[in-house]
């Protein structure tokens, strides 16, 4: 005999919460799938455009096309995260200029010492270290007045660049110690991020120099720079040196500004004069390329008078 059904006694305790959780999970899953599908569709569209162009390249200029493909693959495989996003970003996204410059960058690699990607200052020759420490000591000693001048001249904006020297060309001249030519350091600036401002993953164009960042006001928060598998929180280590042609991003998830010393130093090499000369030759082209890379940045001026060095 069948047992008689028990009369309905209402929902079980927690049943509503279970249904809510299931609904949230399903909604979140659909949202994630939608985002993934959108990204995949975007990548597929890029490949659909690239494949015919690649076919034309192999048909009309096969040797040159092969050289660029091989050099690009050698170059991109230096990165840690070898996934679809890496290859799509390098060949079809903001890494396109890095790919086009890959034959030149690989030639530069042959003229320089081994490049570990992420560097420690101790890995540089002693005269390089002395120059870096000289510049950083000036920033540490004059941090408050430099930040005050930046804040006075950078009212509204997502990201700003306060430049003393840009690939050897002098800009802001109110710090007398920076009004000279350095042997190895070719760019001296301060990078400023407004609150909760971050970059996307991106590649830099040239490997003639390395990027040195130093956080002037490290805060214990989600403020970091990430290059491949290396994630550097500024409160743990205020200095980060890396090859910016590798995939990287900078994140400021803090309700305040982030101020980082921003320097480019020529690659350590048995031929430092040659590397410096090559950088001087391409500096005009580099400036034009960088104007595209830094289109979301505001170049910050200064209202402070020029500081004349006293003797």
Sequence positions of predicted segments:
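N-terminal alpha-helical membrane-insertion module
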Residues: 2-5, 18, 22-114
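Conserved metal-binding segment of the jelly-roll/cupin
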Residues: 233-247
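A short beta-strand-loop-beta hairpin characteristic of the jelly-roll/cupin
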Residues: 215-236
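Non-heme Fe(II)/2-oxoglutarate
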Residues: 64, 72-178
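Short beta-strand His + acidic residue motifs that chelate non-heme Fe in jelly-roll/DSBH
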Residues: 200-202, 223-225, 242, 248-254
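A short hydrophobic beta-strand segment most commonly corresponding to one strand
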Residues: 211-215, 241, 256-272
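A short glycine-rich, His/Asp/Glu-containing loop-to-beta-strand
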Residues: 176-195, 208
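Short, conserved beta-strand element in jelly-roll/cupin
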Residues: 192-194, 205-221
């Amino acid at each position: 005999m069948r047992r008689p059904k028990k009369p309905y006694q209402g929902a079980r305790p927690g049943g509503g919460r279970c249904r809510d959780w299931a609904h949230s999970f399903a909604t979140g899953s659909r949202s994630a799938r939608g985002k993934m599908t959108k990204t995949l569709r975007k990548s597929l569209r890029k490949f659909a455009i690239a494949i015919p162009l690649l076919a034309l390249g192999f048909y009309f200029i096969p040797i040159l096309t092969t050289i660029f493909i091989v050099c690009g693959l050698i170059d991109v495989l230096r990165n840690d995260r070898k996934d679809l996003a890496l290859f799509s970003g390098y060949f079809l996204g903001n890494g396109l200029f890095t790919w086009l410059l890959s034959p030149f960058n690989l030639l530069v690699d042959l003229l320089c010492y081994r490049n570990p990607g992420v560097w420690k200052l101790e890995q540089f020759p002693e005269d390089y270290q002395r120059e870096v420490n000289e510049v950083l000591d000036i920033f540490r000693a004059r941090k408050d007045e430099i930040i005050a001048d930046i804040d006075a001249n950078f009212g509204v904006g997502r990201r700003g660049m306060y430049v003393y020297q840009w690939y050897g060309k002098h800009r802001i001249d109110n710090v007398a110690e920076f009004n000279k030519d350095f042997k190895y350091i070719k760019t001296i600036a301060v990078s400023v991020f407004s609150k909760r401002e971050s970059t996307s993953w991106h590649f830099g164009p040239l490997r003639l120099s390395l990027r040195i960042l130093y956080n002037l006001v490290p805060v214990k928060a989600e403020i970091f720079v990430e290059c491949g598998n290396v994630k550097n929180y500024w409160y743990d280590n205020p200095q980060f040196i890396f090859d910016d042609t590798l995939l990287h991003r900078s994140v400021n998830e803090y309700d305040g500004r982030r101020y980082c010393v921003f320097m480019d130093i020529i690659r350590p090499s048995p031929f430092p004069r040659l590397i410096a000369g090559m950088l001087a030759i391409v500096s005009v082209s580099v400036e034009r390329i960088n104007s595209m890379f830094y289109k979301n940045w505001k170049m910050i001026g200064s209202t402070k008078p020029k500081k004349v060095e006293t003797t």
